[in-house]
């Protein structure tokens, strides 16, 4: 199976496909890679010329082209035959509303649990953890939004503490409690800095999920929750939710190694770093697998749940002990 996630970031370049080779020409010269070894192509270049032959051959090989602005996807070019399993597509469309809601609830529960797990790792003394834990493990309405707000507050404080000029904070009382509520970080699709690092990481995650969906014949254009909000591949956005903390952890590690906010930019070095997270090994069920393998396992479970209308086959990923170790 194809496995390379190719990032195109040259300021000015030309992309084409000749003799089965993805070809990129830029001021640095010409680089080639067999298209059959490519899972997806992420284009963040400010000025890239894309030859029509690349679109044609990418479609034949099942390769998604993800075109970004400010390091977040704005266009997804998918193969026309993205779902060759007609029975599966019909089953997905015919899911009863109750089943769809249950599948989404399992997804949200896993995402919130994963955010809690990561927050406990990066900020074990943060006073806001208790409230996050109650919500993440509970059944509050709109728990996804509540957990997200709490998680990003904790994440923002934890990353700002990595800056050498940030005053030392204490977990309770005094300066620590005050500073913990005054993080300057806000998670948005814009904003630069950490947001750019996260956006690019999520684009890598999206491309990995898309590859697995194509592999099992699931049409990513039909989702279980994101359909009203996303215009392209809502199912990919749905199933990637529990894996977002994997990107968040990768970004946190980068910030730990590069504590000056001036270095929080999407550089070539960062791209190489973040695109490696699908190869990290984590626990899933009774196995230790690469994250990309876990994604495939989750997608296959979702496929079976859809075909047999039994939500028990869908088992979103939650981290085991030691997942967030350095």
Q: What are the residue ranges of the model-derived segments?
A:
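A positional/architectural concept
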Residues: 8, 17-43, 50-51
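Glycine/small-residue-rich interface belts in oligomeric ring/scaffold proteins
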Residues: 36-85
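A cross-taxon signal for low-complexity, glycine/charged-rich
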Residues: 167, 171-177
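Active-site helix-to-loop segments that bind/position phosphate- or nucleotide-bearing substrates
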Residues: 2-13, 17, 25, 33, ...
């Amino acid at each position: 199976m194809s496995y390379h996630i190719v990032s195109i970031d040259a300021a000015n370049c030309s992309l084409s496909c000749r003799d089965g080779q993805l070809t990129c020409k830029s001021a640095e010269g010409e680089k080639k890679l067999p298209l059959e070894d490519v899972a997806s192509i992420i284009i963040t270049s400010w000025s890239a010329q894309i030859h029509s032959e690349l679109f044609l051959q990418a479609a034949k090989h099942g390769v998604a082209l993800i075109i970004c602005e400010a390091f977040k996807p704005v266009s997804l070019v998918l193969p026309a035959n993205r779902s060759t399993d007609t029975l599966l597509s019909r089953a997905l469309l015919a899911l009863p509303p109750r089943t769809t809601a249950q599948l989404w609830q399992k997804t949200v529960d896993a995402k919130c649990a994963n955010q809690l797990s990561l927050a406990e790792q990066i900020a074990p003394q943060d006073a806001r953890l208790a409230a996050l834990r109650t919500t993440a493990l509970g059944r509050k309405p709109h728990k996804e939004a509540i957990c997200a707000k709490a998680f990003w507050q904790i994440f923002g404080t934890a990353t700002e503490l990595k800056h050498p000029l940030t005053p030392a904070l204490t977990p309770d009382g005094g300066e620590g409690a005050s500073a913990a509520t005054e993080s300057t970080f806000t998670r948005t699709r814009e904003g630069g800095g950490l947001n750019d690092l996260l956006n690019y990481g999520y684009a890598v995650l999206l491309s990995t999920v898309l590859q697995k969906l194509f592999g099992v014949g699931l049409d990513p254009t039909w989702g279980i929750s994101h359909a009203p909000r996303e215009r392209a591949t809502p199912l990919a956005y749905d199933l990637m939710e529990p894996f977002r903390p994997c990107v968040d952890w990768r970004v946190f590690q980068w910030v730990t190694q590069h504590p000056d906010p001036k270095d929080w930019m999407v550089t070539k070095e960062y791209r190489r770093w973040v695109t490696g997270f699908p190869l990290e090994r984590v626990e899933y069920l009774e196995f230790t697998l690469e994250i990309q393998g876990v994604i495939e396992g989750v997608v296959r479970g979702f496929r079976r749940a859809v075909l047999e209308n039994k939500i028990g086959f869908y088992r979103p990923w939650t981290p085991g002990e030691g997942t967030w170790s350095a």
